Design a protein with these regions (language model features):
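Thiamine diphosphate
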Residues: 1-292
């Protein structure tokens, strides 16, 4: 699955107003499609919601085999299996998409992607309780922990345009590791401190002067909440650092020195903020930390 290292790709999305990361992902797909002629993909009957259409590229069919948009129908498991098959065939770069809560149906094939070293990209939108009118059946809770528990799968939950760009560049550059992009339905404001450091999986997005007394760690839609909480705590005289953790797996791939610089052991007061299950955050917050 050799490919160009798109992590050095200079084109990053710009964001001037609040926008959903699913929409930003759709823009990134349409930026990358010209850079990756073999890029092909689609959704399990949720294309308009997942924002996965490549504009002007036509629909794949028996009559139009050159079409780059695949309509898989309501069959998430088969879709992911087909995605693996496309990648194993070679010459093409595939992505598949559905609602995040339906990653339960995708999981067996995602596990095979990870086992086989197939760098398929999973676009998973509507990532928390902010899913609209569908209610609890469509509200993912434990799915994020489930995917993060899978060896050789990178799970990216970006907070804005910059991090969404980093997520797609990481996915497009991967040679042996599949990537899951976990994206919002609701609009998120751009975060001033977000940067290409997101390519490292975790980084300081908003810092204080000197040594922090408290570290707030968040991903996706909760990064904005962490930044707002920092402002309130600092108004009370507390030194706070905010760490954005869009991809735990990538963060763990960084050097011990880098990880220590971002999350110094000496700072034991830590709070993780994420609108899903707290499972998996213990290694970052420690025994003295908390989860919201």
């Amino acid at each position: 699955f050799g490919c160009r290292a798109y992590t050095d790709f200079e084109v990053m999305l710009e964001q001037e107003k609040p926008e959903a990361t699913r929409s930003l992902s759709g823009k990134m797909i349409n930026l990358l499609k010209d850079e990756i002629p073999g890029m092909i993909g689609g959704s399990a009957d949720l294309g308009p919601s997942n924002k996965t259409e490549m504009k002007g590229e036509g629909d794949f069919s028996a009559e139009n085999p050159a079409g780059r948009n695949i309509h898989f129908g309501v069959r998430e498991l088969a879709m992911a299996a087909i995605g693996n098959g496309i990648m194993l065939h070679g010459g093409l770069r595939a992505y598949v998409a559905t609602f995040f809560v339906f990653s339960d149906y995708v999981k067996p094939m995602a596990r095979l992607s990870a086992l086989m070293g197939v760098p398929l990209t999973f676009v998973l939108t509507h990532d928390s309780i902010g899913v609209g009118e569908d209610g609890p059946t469509h509200e993912p809770i434990e799915q994020l922990a489930m995917l993060r528990a899978m060896p050789n799968l990178r799970v990216f939950r970006p907070c804005d345009a910059t991090e969404t760009s980093a997520a797609w560049l990481t996915a497009a550059s991967s040679e042996k590791t599949p990537t899951a992009l976990v994206l919002t339905r609701q609009n998120l404001a751009p975060i001033t401190g977000s940067s290409r450091e997101a390519l490292k999986g975790g980084y300081v997005i908003d810092d204080c002067e000197g040594t922090p007394e408290v570290i707030l760690i968040a991903s996706g839609s909760e990064v904005e909440l962490a930044v707002k909480a920092k402002a309130e705590l600092e108004a009370e005289g507390t030194k706070v650092r905010v760490v954005s953790m869009p991809c735990m797996e990538l963060f763990e791939e960084q050097s011990a020195e880098y990880r220590e610089a971002v999350l110094p052991r000496a700072v034991r007061k830590r709070v993780a903020i994420e609108a899903l299950s707290d499972f998996g955050w213990g290694k970052y917050v420690g025994l003295d930390g908390a989860y919201v």
